[in-house]
């Protein structure tokens, strides 16, 4: 009888689904792959799709394959699957399978194993009768598998252990409740109302004492006056007591401004001591006494007034060459105000000498009109800048040999004329 009705088909599908939920039927009977969706109903095993193809190659007389979901099942086919299953089938066909045997995973090896198992019956236990095995119920298999769930059904011990814990938890709040009530009453202070009045009187007395203490403290103005009066007036502007005076009086501001001005003047005086200011009329005047050598008898000694040069640093004396007999220049004392106040160190050389082209060159430079060094103290002496630039234009302060020359080294003036001008090569 074929299940043509829809109700029978649904009922058969439900039976197959229940069979697949069994532990042995969750894996392929041949390769042990998970989730078999095919079955050989005459053998009564669930297999995977790869093993189903090999079973079809064995022939219908050995194995008949059907899909669990796609094909229609009959009552006879469902009955065969219920009687066998993967557990009983492996007990029959793999009875003599070695314990160290590894199930193959490659298709040719799997096909050889399936043929040995079902076609050649190489591992089959021939002493067992298939019909008796089919009619045998699965009580033995269920009893062998049931001890595991029975062991899992022992959580009663844990419940007994949890019960005393609950009792202890219930006793804890009961014991803690009377303890929590006592501090609440003490905090409110309802039992001792008299103590509150006493405390209030004590606090009022304490406040009165505090007010008396504040009244006895002197005012900040009086403290500041005492501090200002005790401080010395000649103190520095950045002293600590003045910085601590947080309430200065208006009269002290004028004193502070006067001190600040004095401090500024003292700072400026430091710079003034290094660079003293000279009057314009005394810039080009000669020092107190200046002696000229015998070669220039026309220049007498000039004695300027002491009021002009008084209190100033003595001017440095440099060396100026004096023409001699052999073309060399002899040293001559030169004032600091000479040539517009130029320092004599500007004219200085390592040997204190200067070379010239000819002995008579410096004669014109040294022979200046007597009006420059006038004897009258009140006369304002000024230097003629045009003569200054003309005479200084021919000077070369940095020669090739580190000496000051006029276009020629020392001893080289014999071959040049007296009125020869400077060499143009020196100004390149």
From Swiss-Prot:
Residues 163-231 are annotated as: Interaction with clathrin heavy chains. Residues 218-262 are annotated as: Disordered. The keyword Phosphoprotein applies. The modification Phosphoserine is found at residues 127, 219, 224, 230, 239. Residues 13-139 form the Arf-GAP domain. Residues 252-262 have a biased composition (Basic and acidic residues). GO terms for cellular component: cytosol; nucleoplasm. Keywords: Cytoplasm, GTPase activation, Metal-binding, Phosphoprotein, Zinc, Zinc-finger. GO terms for molecular function: GTPase activator activity; zinc ion binding. Pfam families: ArfGap. InterPro entries: ARF_GTPase-activating (IPR051718), ARFGAP/RecO (IPR037278), ArfGAP_dom (IPR001164), ArfGAP_dom_sf (IPR038508). It is found in: Cytoplasm. Residues 339-428 are annotated as: Interaction with PICALM. PROSITE patterns: ARFGAP. CDD domains: ArfGap_SMAP2. A zinc finger (C4-type) spans 28-51. PANTHER family: FI20236P1, STROMAL MEMBRANE-ASSOCIATED PROTEIN 2. GTPase activating protein that acts on ARF1. Can also activate ARF6 (in vitro). May play a role in clathrin-dependent retrograde transport from early endosomes to the trans-Golgi network. Interacts with ARF1. Interacts with PICALM and clathrin heavy chains. This is Stromal membrane-associated protein 2. It comes from Mus musculus.
